[in-house]
A protein has these predicted regions:
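Generic beta-strand structural signal
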Residues: 85, 91-93, 103, 115-117, ...
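Ligand-binding loop in jelly-roll beta-barrel domains
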Residues: 98-127
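Long amphipathic alpha-helical segments that form oligomerization/scaffold cores
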Residues: 123-150
Length: 219
């Protein structure tokens, strides 16, 4: 196994988007403008409905892929291709915008906690004018690797015998939701062709190696 060094540690920047949704932005700021192929990474989450109730009314995208992963709460998606979807805890929405799409993401709740992530991925130039596509992945489709000290939900890529449902994309993405017991280790052979990041949702992390970018997020 080849170790790779941690190149940067970044604290997310407080921001807002859509119709006043409060969030924490890690990529797409003055600290990290771009981490190829990642254009933006946002964490949205609050128990105060005023922080999210405005949602993300209809707006355009072009030439990127957006990946939304819900931890709790519910969002409704609707776009100009006619696709609709309702996301709940554990669900993933993967959207290829290609030549252009208009979509909205609105909370399907008026109280309670809403928490999730959205990642923007740059599309290669030769795919930027492709037909847009919306992919909804139910939490039940996710395979999970479990052992005595860790639980790994595989959204994309493969860990052990668990393989993610996200396939057929411009790169071979690897996207894990990892839960570790205290003072335990997580080891993974990352392809040399990939840039990477780790986002810490809770607790702290010690590392001896490298990940090309780590974000409180470790980039």
């Amino acid at each position: 196994m080849k170790n790779i060094e941690v190149s940067k540690i970044v604290e997310p920047v407080t921001a807002s988007d859509g119709a006043g949704v409060k969030l924490k932005r890690s990529i797409g700021t003055h600290l990290i403008d771009y981490h190829d192929p990642f254009l933006m990474l946002d964490e949205f989450g609050s128990e105060n409905k005023d922080d999210y109730i405005g949602g993300f009314p209809p707006h355009p995208h072009r030439g990127i892929e957006t990946v939304t992963y819900m931890l709790c709460g519910e969002f409704e998606h609707e776009d100009s291709t006619g696709a609709k979807g309702r996301m709940s805890a554990g669900d993933v929405q993967w959207m290829k915008t290609g030549g252009g799409i208009i979509h909205s993401e609105m909370p399907a709740m008026t109280e309670g906690k809403l928490h999730g992530f959205q990642l923007w991925i740059n599309m290669p130039a030769k795919y930027k004018m492709n037909k847009p596509e919306y992919i909804y992945i139910d939490a039940k489709e996710m395979q999970i690797h479990k052992d005595d000290d860790k639980k790994i939900k595989v959204i994309a890529g493969k860990f052990g015998e668990a393989e993610g449902p996200v396939k057929g994309h411009n790169v071979e993405p690897i996207y894990f939701d990892v839960e570790l017991e205290k003072n335990k280790e997580f080891n993974f052979d990352l392809p040399s062709t990939h840039n990477s990041l780790i986002y810490l949702i809770e607790e702290k992390l010690k590392w001896e190696s490298k990940i090309t970018i780590l974000l409180k997020i470790l980039l």
